Amino acid sequence: MGKRTPRELRLRRHNRIRKRVFGTPERPRLNVFRSHVHIYAQVIDDTVGHTLVAASTNEKGWSGSPELTKTQEAALVGKLIAERALQAGITKVVFDRGGYKYHGRVKALAEAAREAGLNF
């Protein structure tokens, strides 16, 4: 068996985390996916497997400017997902970092969502 790729290692971590992190209708899961260029956030009800709200830097009409860093854009996505969740009546979530370290863009998104009113 060869050396595992960073993607395989992240997926193993994510599966390990998902054994404990589960979204309910009262407290859905805030999931984060980070690609090299974009960052995506979804609020998911795992009991039925539905995405309740979503936000990303890959959306049509994204208002990010070329002067912003990826970390600053992640903070804007965090604020946007929190605003959309609050409009949908969601105040409490369970944070799922997706196997990524709680650092950099993932941390910026989470802190911006907390500041905008989401509790986790």
Swiss-Prot record:
Keywords: Ribonucleoprotein, Ribosomal protein, RNA-binding, rRNA-binding
Biological role: This is one of the proteins that bind and probably mediate the attachment of the 5S RNA into the large ribosomal subunit, where it forms part of the central protuberance.
HAMAP family given in the database record: Ribosomal_uL18_B (MF_01337_B)
Keyword RNA-binding found: yes
InterPro entries reported for this sequence: Ribosomal_uL18_bac-type, Ribosomal_uL18_bac/euk
Subunit structure, interactors included: Part of the 50S ribosomal subunit; part of the 5S rRNA/L5/L18/L25 subcomplex. Contacts the 5S and 23S rRNAs.
GO biological process: translation
Cellular compartments per GO CC: cytosolic large ribosomal subunit
Record lineage: Bacteria, Bacillati, Chloroflexota, Chloroflexia, Chloroflexales
Annotated protein name in UniProt: Large ribosomal subunit protein uL18
